[in-house]
Each structure stands twice: as C-alpha cells, then as structure tokens.
C-alpha cells in the first residue's frame, strides 16, 4: 500500500485494514512454523511494513485532530 492511498482512508477504514493485515500475518507465520513452504517468503516482510505504514499514518491523523 502506498502512503497516499492510506491518507485517503478514514480512521475506521485504517483500523479495519490493520486488523485484516494482522490476521493475514498470523496465518502466514502459522504456515511457516508448521513447516509449509511459502509461495513468496517476502509476504511476511511486506505485511509487517504495511501494518507499520498504516499505524504511522493513523497516528499522524490522530495528532492533527488535536
């Protein structure tokens, strides 16, 4: 996800996306621990970075409301 796409979202949409990505990350990590080979091992890193991006922009929006 690009930061510009995230900035267009409202706080509720950002929260939903964070939850969705965290569930997907847990699923991918579970597959990895069970020994299943991942189709694309970069998925875990990308998910973590997307979550961090979402949290950062969420925090920016909350601070700007003050």
Swiss-Prot record:
PROSITE patterns: RIBOSOMAL_L29 (PS00579). GO terms for biological process: translation. Keywords: Ribonucleoprotein, Ribosomal protein. GO terms for molecular function: structural constituent of ribosome. GO terms for cellular component: ribonucleoprotein complex; ribosome. Pfam families: Ribosomal_L29. Belongs to the universal ribosomal protein uL29 family. HAMAP family: Ribosomal_uL29. This is Large ribosomal subunit protein uL29.
